[in-house]
Each structure stands twice: as C-alpha cells, then as structure tokens.
C-alpha cells in the first residue's frame, strides 16, 4: 500500500504566498481572495480520512504525527506546520464547515485515494466521489451566495490535483481486475481518462485555473526500496514503468484540454524530477538521509509502523533530528522537504513548473 506525501506545508506555504497579492480588511480577513479547491491523495489529505470508516494505516491522527509544530496529531501525514494567517483550508468532511470557509477553498483529498474506483475500494474517498463532494459544496454555495457570486468564486479559484500513484501501486498490493485484463498502457490510459473526466467536469462547473503535480518517484520511497528483500535499496521497477508512462502521457492531455477548452489554464509541476533529485543527492538540498525514513521500522525504516499504526507489537523507531531526513515515514516527506517542493510549485521556473506556476495562476484574471 502506498500513501503519498501530504499537503500540509504545500497548501499553507502557498496560502502564505497568496497574501502578497490580496487585500486585507480590518478583521485581518482576505477580501479579494481566490479560493483553492484541492483534490487527490495523501499529498493533499488535510484530515478527511479521520471522518470515514477506514483502517488505521490510512490515517495519521496518532503520535508522532504533528509533533514538530501542531504539538498534537491532526490526521495530516507529515510533521509540517500551519502558519498561515488566512483562514485555513479545511478537510471537506470536517464537521461544522461553514459556507464562508468554502469560499476560501476546501480539500476533498483522501489518503490512499486513486482515480480508479477499485483502488483500495471502501477504505478511501476515490476521485469520482471527491468530485461528487465538490458538487455538494457547489449546491451549498449557490444556496448561500446565489448563482452569480458562486460563479465568480469558481471562475477565480485554483483547482489543485495530485492523483494516480495509488492506482499504480494497488495492483501489486491486491487483486486488480482492471490491471489483469488490460495492457499496462491501457491501464495507464484508464487512470488518466478518469482524471481527465473530473477536470472536464470541474471546468463545466466554472473552473478555469488548474494546478497539477505529476506522479512522484514513489518507486524509490523507503517503503518501495524494501519491497524486494533480496535487493534492499533498489527502486521498485514494476511501478516505475507505470509512473513513467503516466508522466509522459499526462502533459499531452493538458495541452489538448488547453486547445479545446476556452479559458483553460494550468500549472504542471515536475514533482518526479524534483523529488528524485533530493532522493539521489540529498546533501545538495541540505539533507543527510534521502532514502531512510525518520519514523518507521525495518530496513531504511521502510515498514509503515510509525505511531504503531499496525499495532503496538510491531514497534517503531524515531529519528533524533527530523531536519536531516527527506522522508518522515515510509512514503511521506518532512516539513523541510515540503517547504522546498512548495516553493517550486508556487514560484518555480518554467523548467520545473509550466506553462504557469501557481503564483501566476492566482494572479491571472480571466475575462
């Protein structure tokens, strides 16, 4: 099972940056704020899995998650902080979410989620269900704000996506009928097709500005590096092949959508390259460990036992200095790593985030 890096520092670093391009009233609230709506997996799960009936390995509302800044577990899969002065972007399923919060955005993401409904079925909120939840938010906003204001909110908002990696790991963790009955290329096409459908649906609802990360090098996460116990430290090649296909095909889809959909604009961050560079050359980016996790057990702490999530009998180790590490647990990054990646997504040059970066998307005013 793979569970991808979370949005904690991504979104809140991004929110901090947004502050420079918005006005603030006397109550310190943004009065001209473009919303951020977030879809995806554990890269962006702000705690939705706390509110569904799932297994502990898909949650992180346990110690030591949150130890560095929150001082308590929040359900977010990193030890990163929340430092923004703006209203925080809540998980969609958090009780008592008010419509006023939704005007700033909301995260629909779910740790372990995929674009395919069969990926970890019954344990996560898949991308199609996340879309349905977004449609429910639309209804609430239309009721509260009216059609015209809701249309304005949606047209100015940015829609951020990271999804797909769980679909590519799932066939190697469980029985996938879709994977078994199709070629690898066709399977990747199914994943991308489901993502494309959701993008087009959000566009029909008024969305125009989209941010994407391609699929990261999770074939080389600590968890993946120990999958073949005869080759500890080797990346998991079966998944690498699928991820490579995805990352080659997906940019073509986005270019096609930009040609076909009037006003469609996007930012695509090359997350695979950004994270690969840090895994392979950690010292260049200020890390001592690029392949061993801070929290977990077994070789490279690659067994996902952080916080005794699979039972106290297993136990786990915890590093002394988390800033030395790229990975916090077997699949998720540390705050320091999040900060670096977030800056590349927000304000990165065209060789890493293109054709727009996220800052440019927020500043963009479409007529």
Swiss-Prot record:
Any keyword Nucleotide-binding? no
**How far does the signal peptide extend, from start to end residue?**
1-23
- This protein's major location comes to secreted
Pfam families recorded: Lipase_GDSL
Q: Which domain of life is it from?
A: Eukaryota
For this UniProt record, the keywords arranged alphabetically read as follows: Glycoprotein, Hydrolase, Lipid degradation, Lipid metabolism, Secreted, Signal
A molecular-function term among this protein's GO annotations: lipase activity
Record: active site: 42, 329, 332
User: Which cellular component, as a GO term, is one annotated location?
Assistant: extracellular region
Which EC numbers characterise this protein's activity in its record?
3.1.1.-
**Where do glycans attach?**
175, 194, 321, 351
Q: Where in the cell is it found?
A: Secreted
Indicate yes or no for the key word Secreted.
yes
Task: Return the similarity comment.
Answer: Belongs to the 'GDSL' lipolytic enzyme family.
Mind telling me which PANTHER family this protein's record contains?
GDSL ESTERASE_LIPASE 3, GDSL-LIKE LIPASE/ACYLHYDROLASE
Name of this chain's protein: GDSL esterase/lipase 3
Its taxonomic placement starts with: Eukaryota, Viridiplantae, Streptophyta, Embryophyta, Tracheophyta
